[in-house]
């Protein structure tokens, strides 16, 4: 859009300084980061200190999966996801599988749906992470993300819940706390923002 193009040009020409620097360019850049972090936090209904900027959706998803698995590995070994996640999630899950984690890839039906029953059956007391996208980027299926936290609680699992909201952000209302999500991935380019900018709610 015209508005986003103007803002992007402004960031490239006026606010390109190192935000860690003490000179004016750096200070101005830091102000923009603080404003952006606050805007994203407000859109999700979370605290600004819970937002980490990344280089995009892939890094946000990688960080969520590897970070959660390593943080919880003493409490269990099972990771539950679906077979139709974004490649950044699937490849991370496969790498964790090579490292010795038990990864369950839930298979969708012919319409691309994953049922709540599949989720409840897959999540057990040994589950340390459940990762699922909110809306599938290929077929548009709305996944049962609201049931993920319910499945974790029902199983008495120590699992963290990661929801990939990249395709959903800006289209549906997302509140990580209401979803019971510990980690949420989003990215700018899906809402007409610049490429190479993403965020992870932690």
Which positions does each model-derived feature cover?
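Pyridoxal 5′-phosphate
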Residues: 1-202
